[in-house]
């Protein structure tokens, strides 16, 4: 090894150590001038010996040639969002759920129960990122994106000075994924804006926007010039048995963690921490919008698991939003995907929490009435959750004499169609109650440009039909040029029509045609979600597809039958039923599925879910009818006494009295004396028979499936299918798919990148399948891949 090479290695090690002491320990050991001298010495030596330059050298943070675009990165483990709390009541409820979920005794606020230990740290207002280390070296940085897919920002991440390019010490896993927040301090933000003003550049509204904009620069040299910092808040591979232990170990390896990190013993400690940080919020060197609390025990986190898009073991306690006074200049109306006509406040521009606000949500006309809002009023504006501006209240003493009432338009501001007022109806326990509220809708449907654009945007989105290349602006062009009038028209678009659109050339036009063609075989769940049924999100669409397993059954299902599905209440069930009853929607769906028109072919259709089919009983059906005064217990007594629905309907008063007290017996008799009620009950029963899920039907039950009673765990990435698809296939065999490994786990499917779950499975001696073996297992049970 030459003297120059030796000196280069010495300088790198020394500079790395100084970086660590400065950025992580906050204990600088040398003056800045001495650091600069060492840095420039290293830079000069590397210039003389370019063959000795390595990616992990401190000099390589300065940026490189500009990129044309960021590439997408799929997160092996999704970067989930957190549930929010805006008051102490919600925090207490969160603690209660955690305590009950861990089967601990629930005590009062100040003691008497088993206090859960929580980690506490400020919620930085920046951009969430993932850092991937291989053998201790930083190999990739990615944004959170939508939680599943982000952008590869590796070149820019390497310019953030307190992110170690190589981990310190030893003992780190071969693959380590660290997660945290890239942010800009208040002082750094002020310096950046001052320098931008000096050169006539664009200034930023707040540190978060500055951090996000800087990190997503295609030219990494610009990113390198910005005062960005990183703070680690988690890791995907457990390296300790507690969350705080994980962070402390990461700190030893060179990762900056929050100086405010603290362990709280019980919810009262959490509330005290929140109040303390809130009082010191303005004096902190960075902006925060709340505090994050996490169950500290990793084992407890695994036991609590996840729901939909967030962990059950963590919550963000947000600070109250900041408020300002301004003038309401006007109220305009916008039209949404479902035709709802909603008011939007146009405001005299005012800065709220560092952001200039000129528009604010008013939700609906009921909100306008509740506020007593008039055009010309002075209003209080709040950034709810520090994000969405909203009008909180009116200052009545400042109302001018010429203030005007807010009037809902009689015709749609977009298409001119009639605006219809529909009274809101609440359904609870079989009763329909007309509420004071109302919704205003444009009756133009897809003839209304606003509704059509929003419907198409939703239809083609990544989690729906996933048609790449159809951005919002392209959809606006297609609608404005009258090239499409419904989602079905997308499938009749020709190359000659697309190439004439702004922003399209030969290759991009052909790519769009191919993307549209490739979308013709969606899964049933994606198709249901793409239809844009009110109140039906991605998870509900998956439940509908997994349980009913055919579009025909979903279309025909009565509301009471739909309520057998997990997490589908009567309100949502009525929305689903009403959507498919609508003749206009039937026409659009018919065109999409017609071989002569669009020719979509839905995948994953088949037999009714065995678990769903086995979920019905006569007592359960009687309970779903919501007979006044009759709850689940009384319904089961009727089922035990009369055995059949027809027997209940035809039972006379004396027979009824043998099963129930007088008041309940009278209520049941009066209910079924109404022919509409009796006929509706029989119609529900007939549908249960038609679907093969009647309690007397010969049907497959979950216990008869090959993997019934077995718990499986999926970890790592799979190449031939997503983990969601793998989960669906296992559940179709009767298996339960869990998020954590335990002694009760039957089998673990481990793909590339499998971490602690695979290690735990090996430790417990559990059966482990790689993807090839898993595919063979599915084939054995005639499950296609």
Curated annotation (Swiss-Prot):
Its EC number is 6.5.1.2. GO terms for biological process: DNA repair; DNA replication. It comes from the Bacteria. One of its GO terms (cellular component) is cytosol. PROSITE patterns: BRCT, DNA_LIGASE_N1, DNA_LIGASE_N2. It is an enzyme of class 6 (ligase). NAD(+) binds at residues 32-36, 81-82, 121, 144, 181, 294, 318. Residues 702-785 form the BRCT domain. Its cofactor is Mg(2+); Mn(2+). The active site is at residue 123. Pfam families: BRCT, DNA_ligase_aden, DNA_ligase_OB, HHH_2, HHH_5, Nlig-Ia. DNA ligase that catalyzes the formation of phosphodiester linkages between 5'-phosphoryl and 3'-hydroxyl groups in double-stranded DNA using NAD as a coenzyme and as the energy source for the reaction. It is essential for DNA replication and repair of damaged DNA. It comes from Pseudomonas fluorescens (strain SBW25). HAMAP family: DNA_ligase_A. One of its GO terms (molecular function) is DNA binding. InterPro entries: BRCT_dom (IPR001357), BRCT_dom_sf (IPR036420), DisA/LigA_HHH (IPR041663), DNA_ligase (IPR001679), DNA_ligase_AS (IPR018239), DNA_ligase_CS (IPR033136), DNAligase_adenylation (IPR013839), DNAligase_N (IPR013840). Keywords: DNA damage, DNA repair, DNA replication, Ligase, Magnesium, Manganese, Metal-binding, NAD, Zinc. The keyword DNA damage applies. It catalyses: NAD(+) + (deoxyribonucleotide)n-3'-hydroxyl + 5'-phospho-(deoxyribonucleotide)m = (deoxyribonucleotide)n+m + AMP + beta-nicotinamide D-nucleotide. Zn(2+) binds at residues 412, 415, 442, 448. Belongs to the NAD-dependent DNA ligase family. LigA subfamily. Gene3D superfamilies: 5' to 3' exonuclease, C-terminal subdomain (1.10.150.20), 6.20.10.30, BRCT domain (3.40.50.10190), DNA ligase/mRNA capping enzyme (3.30.470.30), Helix hairpin bin (1.10.287.610), Nucleic acid-binding proteins (2.40.50.140). This is DNA ligase. SMART domains: BRCT (SM00292), HhH1 (SM00278), LIGANc (SM00532).
């Amino acid at each position: 090894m030459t003297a120059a090479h030796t000196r280069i290695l010495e300088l790198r090690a020394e500079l790395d150590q100084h970086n660590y002491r400065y950025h992580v320990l906050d204990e600088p050991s040398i003056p800045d001038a001495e650091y600069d001298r060492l840095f420039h010495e290293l830079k000069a030596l590397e210039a003389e010996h370019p063959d000795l330059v390595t990616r992990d050298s401190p000099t390589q943070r300065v940026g490189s040639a500009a990129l044309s675009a960021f590439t997408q990165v799929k997160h092996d483990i999704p970067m989930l969002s957190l549930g929010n709390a805006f008051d102490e009541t919600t925090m207490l409820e969160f603690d209660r759920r955690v305590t009950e979920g861990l089967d601990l005794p629930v005590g009062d606020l100040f003691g008497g129960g088993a206090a859960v230990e929580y980690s506490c740290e400020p919620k930085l207002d920046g951009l969430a990122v993932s850092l991937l280390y291989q053998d201790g070296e930083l190999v990739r940085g990615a944004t959170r994106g939508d939680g599943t897919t982000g952008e590869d920002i590796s070149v820019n991440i390497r310019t953030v000075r307190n992110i170690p390019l190589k981990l310190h010490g030893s003992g780190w896993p071969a693959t380590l994924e660290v997660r945290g927040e890239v942010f800009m301090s208040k002082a750094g933000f002020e310096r950046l804006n001052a320098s931008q003003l000096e050169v006539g550049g664009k200034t930023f509204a707040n540190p978060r926007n500055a951090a996000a904009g800087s990190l997503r620069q295609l030219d990494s040299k610009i990113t390198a010039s910005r005062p960005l910092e990183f703070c680690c808040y988690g890791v995907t591979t457990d390296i300790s048995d507690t969350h705080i232990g994980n962070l402390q170990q990461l700190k030893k390896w060179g990762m900056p963690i929050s100086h405010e990190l603290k362990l709280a013993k019980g919810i009262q400690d959490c509330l005290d921490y929140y109040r303390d940080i809130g009082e010191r919020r303005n004096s902190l060197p960075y902006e925060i919008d709340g505090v994050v609390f996490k169950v500290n025990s990793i084992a407890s986190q695994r036991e609590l698991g996840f729901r939909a898009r967030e962990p059950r073991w963590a919550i963000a306690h947000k600070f109250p939003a900041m408020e300002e006074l301004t003038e309401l200049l006007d109220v305009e109306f916008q039209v949404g995907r479902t035709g709802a006509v909603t008011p939007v406040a146009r405001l005299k521009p005012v800065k709220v929490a560092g952001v200039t606000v000129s528009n604010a949500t008013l939700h609906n006309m009921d909100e306008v009435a509740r506020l007593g809002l008039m055009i010309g009023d002075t209003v209080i504006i709040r950034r709810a959750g520090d994000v969405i501006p909203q009008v909180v209240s009116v200052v009545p003493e400042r109302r001018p004499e010429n203030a005007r009432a807010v009037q809902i338009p009689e015709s749609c501001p977009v298409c001119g169609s009639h605006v219809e007022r529909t009274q809101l109806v609440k359904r609870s326990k079989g009763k329909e109650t007309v509420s004071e509220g109302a919704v205003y809708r444009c009756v133009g449907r897809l003839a209304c440009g606003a509704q059509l654009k929003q419907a198409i945007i939703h239809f083609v989105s990544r989690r729906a039909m996933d048609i790449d290349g159809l951005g919002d602006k392209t959809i606006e062009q297609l609608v404005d040029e009258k090239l499409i009038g419904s989602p079905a028209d997308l499938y009749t678009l020709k190359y000659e029509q697309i190439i004439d659109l702004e922003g399209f050339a030969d290759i991009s036009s052909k790519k769009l045609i191919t993307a549209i063609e490739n979308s013709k075989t969606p899964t049933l769940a994606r198709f249901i979600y793409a239809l844009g049924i009110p109140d039906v999100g991605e998870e509900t669409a998956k439940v509908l597809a997994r349980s009913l397993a055919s579009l025909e059954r979903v279309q025909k299902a009565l509301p009471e039958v739909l309520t057998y599905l997990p997490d589908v209440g009567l309100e949502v069930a009525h929305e689903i039923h009403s959507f498919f009853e609508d003749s206009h929607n039937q026409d659009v769906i018919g065109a999409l599925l017609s071989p002569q028109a669009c020719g979509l072919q839905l995948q994953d259709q088949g037999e009714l879910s065995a678990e769903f089919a086995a979920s019905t009983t006569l007592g359960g059906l009687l309970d779903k009818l919501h007979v006044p005064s009759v709850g689940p217990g009384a319904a089961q007594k009727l089922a035990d006494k009369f055995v059949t629905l027809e027997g209940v309907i035809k039972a006379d008063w004396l027979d009824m009295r043998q099963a129930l007290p007088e008041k309940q017996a009278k209520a049941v008799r009066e209910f079924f004396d109404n022919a509409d009620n009796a006929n509706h009950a029989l119609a529900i029963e007939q549908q249960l028979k038609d679907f093969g899920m009647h309690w007397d039907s010969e049907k497959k039950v979950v216990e008869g499936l090959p993997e019934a009673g077995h718990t499986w765990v999926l970890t790592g990435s799979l190449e031939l299918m997503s983990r969601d698809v793998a989960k669906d296939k296992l559940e179709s065999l009767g298996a339960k798919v869990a998020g954590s490994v335990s002694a009760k786990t039957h089998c673990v499917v481990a793909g590339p990148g499998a971490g602690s779950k695979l290690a735990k499975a090996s430790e417990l001696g559990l059966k482990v399948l790689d993807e090839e073996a898993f595919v063979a297992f599915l084939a054995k049970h005639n499950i296609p891949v």
